[in-house]
Amino acid sequence: MATEFQTFNEDLSLTSQTECEDSARAILAKLRPEWTSSEIKFEYFSVGITNKIFSAGFGTEHVIFRVFGHNTSKVIDRENEVTAWRQLAKHGFAAPLYGKFNNGLICGFLEGKSLKIEQMRDSRFHMNIAKRIAQLHASVPTNGKTLVFEKMQEFLKQLDPKFEDATKQEFFVTNFPQNLAAEIEKVEKLVIKSKEPVAFCHNDLLVHNIVFNGETKRIEFIDYEYAFPNYALYDIANHFCEYAGVEGTPDYTKCLTKDEKWLFINDYLHFKDSKNHCDVRMKAMYKHLPLFEATAHLFWAIWALVQAQNSTIDFDYLTYAHARYEQYEKRFQKYIGSVNHH
């Protein structure tokens, strides 16, 4: 098995399946020369809202191709993705990465199935998810600096305040503040003040990125496009926001209750550092949680605004951005209210 990372000068088509598979075979002829080209079987899984994902299999071995969507480099730092992925693979948190082509990556296959939203809401999974997040945060080293606010500012630079479509422009002007940069700065000041610890984070733990292996009963995470050092509590808060689902308009009434969130944080701390697990730490994390939920909502709201102008995928990013922005305001006000109350 070749393990050295390889680069291939091929573009995989997002529109033509035949052309896409021809290019994939050309790559596999070099990556897996022992495979018989005519016997390679392809299976498509695309569930992400930015990529095309499929597997190529020969005999019992499979590799995964991830083809990047058009214009996704505006919201995803591809160099960072490869660096983060290789670091995670080294520590046992990601499938091996075999190589890259002009518009995507080839990696190993993780056994298991992505969770469904009903499963993610099942309390039996909460502990396993909390445990895996804790293991990730405890295992992968970082320099202790987070990039989350820098990333938001980078997204903002990609956003044109003028939408080409008049209806979209009106919606944007009506539902979003003129100065989004000021919102980022406002949140950043409070987050820095919280002094929450930084860890290596996944930053995108929605249902499709959580894989459960029924045989080993283990939870694994996939898709490291947004993985970078961040506040550990951001990773948890962002995960909590995703119980609302991603298909169509998110339903935030489906998010975990206060008690469920408390239990999740309790499990997380128990698995991360049982010796220093105490009520004081629990209460501090719980107090700061709405602020970090607000931060995650703001991140994805701005991300979705950029996608609304650039993505070729049939998804209503503008309505999604609005749903996230409304939640940002709600969670932020909740945090401010609770701080002023004490």
Regions flagged by a language model, labelled:
Residues 169, 277-342:
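Helical subdomain adjoining the active site within ATP-dependent kinase catalytic cores
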Residues 46-65, 185-240, 245-247:
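Active-site acidic catalytic loop and adjacent metal/ATP-binding pocket
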Residues 1-43:
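Juxta-kinase regulatory segment immediately upstream of eukaryotic protein kinase catalytic domains
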Residues 180-184:
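Short proline/glycine- and basic residue-enriched helix-capping loop/turn segments at helix->loop/beta transitions
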Residues 233-276, 294-312:
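Active-site activation/catalytic loop segments of kinase-like enzymes and analogous catalytic loops
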Residues 43-179, 190-197, 215-216:
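ATP-binding pocket architecture of kinase catalytic cores
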Residues 81-83, 237-240, 319:
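Glycine-rich, phosphate-binding/catalytic loops in enzymes
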Residues 32-35, 133, 137-144, 163, ...:
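A general structural signal marking secondary-structure boundaries and capping sites
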